[in-house]
Design a protein with these regions (language model features):
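Signature of dsDNA virion morphogenesis modules
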Residues: 1-194, 198-202
Length: 204
């Protein structure tokens, strides 16, 4: 079976409808990169009998192909470093750090849950993140404070294991690939961290 592959893009003309709306706590994140719970790391300058209730994880990973299906038609989407950078800037400039949901099935933000840190790894500033060393440069991370006791219990119980973004992107068709080609590309990207656009050009 052949699958179309689309590149995620923001609108070049600054159309405000495009971009990230919120970040949800979910059981199965699209990027398959669960967040790290910092409750096990006790600092000396802290009340050691209480949890910090902080989670951190990846929101977007460059060149990671994600399976999607709409109206019964399967396809893949992928974001490059440039789009991820633009999306993170837009999300933060619009002060969306309180836009945190429990799954995407609700329109209500969680109370007492907020994002207080957001960064993108690169060769110069933040090279690697402990627990996520395998993720490539250009990965967007957020750190979230969970003061809501009900939500925190759900995090500890494993009901929420990662982040999932809710966003509207333009889809730019870049190629069509078979099952075998997709599996090969994913294996190469994961193994040598090679940008997807470079690999696609070598196939032409």
């Amino acid at each position: 079976m052949n699958y179309p592959v689309y590149l995620l893009e923001l609108d070049e003309n600054g159309n405000t409808k495009y971009g990230l709306q919120d970040i949800a706590l979910v059981e199965s994140p699209a990027y398959q990169s669960s967040f790290v719970k910092f409750d096990e790391q006790k600092l000396n300058f802290a009340i050691q009998n209480e949890e910090k209730q902080i989670v951190m994880g990846a929101v977007m990973i460059p060149d990671k192909m994600i399976y999607r299906e709409e109206n019964g038609k399967p396809f893949y989407v992928v974001a490059n470093k440039e789009t991820i950078y633009e999306a993170s800037q837009k999300f933060n400039s619009e002060n969306r750090n309180l836009n945190v949901k429990a799954t995407h099935e609700t329109d209500t933000n969680l109370s007492d849950v907020f994002i207080f840190e957001s960064f993108i790894t690169d060769e110069n500033r933040v090279q690697k993140v402990k627990g996520f060393e395998e993720l490539p440069y250009g990965t967007w991370f957020v750190t979230m404070k969970v003061n809501n006791p009900t939500v925190w219990e759900q995090v500890k119980a494993g009901e929420f294991t990662g982040f999932s973004l809710e966003a509207l992107f333009k889809l730019k068709p870049i190629t069509t690939l078979s099952d075998d080609e997709i599996n090969t590309l994913m294996s190469i990207i994961d193994y040598i961290k090679c940008p997807l656009n470079y690999l696609l050009n070598t196939l032409k």
